[in-house]
Swiss-Prot record:
Monomer. Interacts with and forms tight 1:1 complexes with RNH1. Dimerization of two such complexes may occur. Interaction with RNH1 inhibits this protein. PROSITE patterns: RNASE_PANCREATIC. Residues 1-13 have a biased composition (Basic and acidic residues). Residues 1-22 are annotated as: Disordered. CDD domains: RNase_A_canonical. Glycans are attached at N34. SUPFAM superfamilies: RNase A-like. Belongs to the pancreatic ribonuclease family. This is Ribonuclease pancreatic. It comes from Bison bison (American bison).
Amino acid sequence: KETAAAKFERQHMDSSTSAASSSNYCNQMMKSRNLTKDRCKPVNTFVHESLADVQAVCSQKNVACKNGQTNCYQSYSTMSITDCRETGSSKYPNCAYKTTQANKHIIVACEGNPYVPVHFDASV
């Protein structure tokens, strides 16, 4: 079974590119990472930084998560991210996404030993 940490990497990490390559980036990535298998995942963020840099956020600024839990952490520096948002015309199984590139601070929830990101909470 996929671990929470591995799921975070599959859903949110794209260290191989420094930014979204094209407007078609989200359509390709959401499909290749199996985020459109059973339904169209409405919103998803990919982080274009090294895994080590993203894992390091777990020892940075402790903040409250959206759901009220206290195991969220905000990155000290901005990171290159791509937001994927489902378009109005998107219909499963033909999921369609708008690709938006940004440089923002990320907020992730961390747990486990080693203490690693398991959930992408927000970008600010």
